[in-house]
Amino acid sequence: LCRPLHVFDADKIQGNIVIRHSKKGEKFIGLDDQEYTLDDNMVVICDENKIISLAGILGGKNSCCDRETKNILIESAYFLPDSISSTGRKLNIQSDARYRFERGVDPESTKNGINLASRLITKLCGGDLCEIIKDNSSIKRDKFIEISSNFINQILGTNLNDKLIQEKL
């Protein structure tokens, strides 16, 4: 799928999950065992008591899976490339997730990502699936681009009619 996912130990998460902007001076210990001091406006994922992830960059040590993990929460999300790039640069964090989000991930692939990951995990490890929780607060809307058939034909070196172009697009 070429899209980042993150898996949390669900039993280490307390209460509801919130995605918010960090406050200057907040601390976060990543999966790399490094402590990071955050600036204002870095996107973080939190439970009711703590930051559990730098969104789209690095998961937190406090919610990581280990040999005792029994229940998991899979995150399949879309984060804005500019936000990921800015936070990653400021904190000097390199990760596969950062690399992919910075270059753009299809926002429409979140559902396919979580479905595939869920199937693989249950096939390999067993267990039961629960509901998918979806945050619809910032649903991406389709963009419409006006383009003439003359322009398309000029670029492609063809003589396609309007009807055929509309069918293929």
Kindly give the residue locations of the regions a language model identified.
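RNA/tRNA-interacting regions in translation and RNA-turnover enzymes
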Residues: 1-169
